[in-house]
Swiss-Prot record:
Involved in the biosynthesis of the thiazole moiety of thiamine. Catalyzes the conversion of NAD and glycine to adenosine diphosphate 5-(2-hydroxyethyl)-4-methylthiazole-2-carboxylate (ADT), an adenylated thiazole intermediate, using free sulfide as a source of sulfur. One of its GO terms (biological process) is thiazole biosynthetic process. It catalyses: hydrogen sulfide + glycine + NAD(+) = ADP-5-ethyl-4-methylthiazole-2-carboxylate + nicotinamide + 3 H2O + H(+). Binds 1 Fe(2+) ion per subunit. Other divalent metal cations can support activity. SUPFAM superfamilies: FAD/NAD(P)-binding domain. This is Thiamine thiazole synthase. NAD(+) binds at residues 47, 66-67, 74, 138, 164-166, 184, 230. Belongs to the THI4 family. It holds the Pfam family Thi4. Glycine binds at residue 240. Its cofactor is Fe(2+). The gene is thi4. Its EC number is 2.4.2.59.
């Protein structure tokens, strides 16, 4: 036990080579463990993190890939920079489960701190067993006869730099497009494989219709490929909702339930 009363007298053992070796060894061990997963979730926003938590709690090996260095999607900035988001009943219960503080605004509306929400959702997903990796972009999908079989990944920094460096892969039983407004994984699948499918993109804002459509649009859109959150609405031409997030969390939970049913039926 370190006596924190004498911090000035502590001598720290810091060696550059040992630091490098420790990071490399831990990283290789981690990558070797996750190159085969049950579920890969692309996008660490509100729906993706929620989906990851519930799947990990079921005992599945879950890997969440986020191209940016920060998880949380569009939650951090709240509404137009004001540091709160809105969640409506009954989705507030999903936030209470992870200890997020809510302020009752009446009429079934609550506000939550826009920094606290993604932080606690991410910690809860990791505590449940999910692995979250940032700075990783999914540039393609692995396909097999029975559908999607994993993701093709690269460093987002490499992509941004425009360097021609070949990617690596993660095999999985299921892939989830939780990329938000872009629905980028669905678009990759359709465009690269010349599928006869329409990805209409999202419509303008109509919060009530958008929120309710989320739960209808959260589904398996191609064998072993699911959509949740705003990617579900974008891939089905649903409306956007703005800074009200209840449907996003419920969509993530519903997606986890659908995947759980699919994977357990395969066993």
């Amino acid at each position: 036990m370190v006596n924190l009363m004498n911090i000035k007298d502590i001598k720290l053992n810091a060696d550059e080579t040992k630091t490098t070796k420790a990071i490399l060894k831990a990283s290789f061990d981690m990558w070797l463990d996750i190159v085969e997963a049950d579920v890969v979730i692309v996008g660490a926003g509100p729906s993706g993190l929620t989906c990851a938590r519930y799947l990990a709690k079921e005992g599945f090996k879950v890997v969440v890939l986020e191209r940016h260095l920060a998880f949380g999607g569009g939650t951090w900035g709240g509404g137009m920079g004001f540091p709160y988001i809105v969640v409506e009943e009954p989705a507030d219960e999903l936030l209470r489960e992870v200890g997020i503080k809510l302020i009752d605004m009446g009429d079934g509306y609550y506000v939550a701190d826009s920094v606290e929400v993604p932080a606690k959702l991410a910690v809860a997903a990791m505590d449940a067993g999910a692995k979250i990796l940032t700075g990783i972009v999914v540039e393609d999908l692995i396909l097999r006869e029975d559908g999607v079989a994993g993701v093709v990944i690269n460093s987002y920094a490499i992509e941004r730099a425009g360097l021609h460096i070949d990617p690596l892969t993660i095999r999985s039983k299921v892939v989830v497009d939780a990329t938000g407004h872009e629905a980028s994984i669905v678009n990759i699948l359709v465009k690269k494989n010349k599928l006869e499918a329409d990805v209409p993109g999202e419509k303008s804002m109509w919060a009530e219709k958008g929120e309710n459509a989320l739960l209808r649009n959260t589904r398996e859109v191609y064998p072993n490929l699911f959509v949740c959150g705003m990617a579900a609405n974008a891939s089905h031409g649903g409306y956007r909702m703005g800074a009200i997030f209840g449907g996003m969390y419920l969509s993530g939970k519903l997606c986890a339930e659908l995947i759980t049913e699919k994977l357990k039926n395969k066993e």
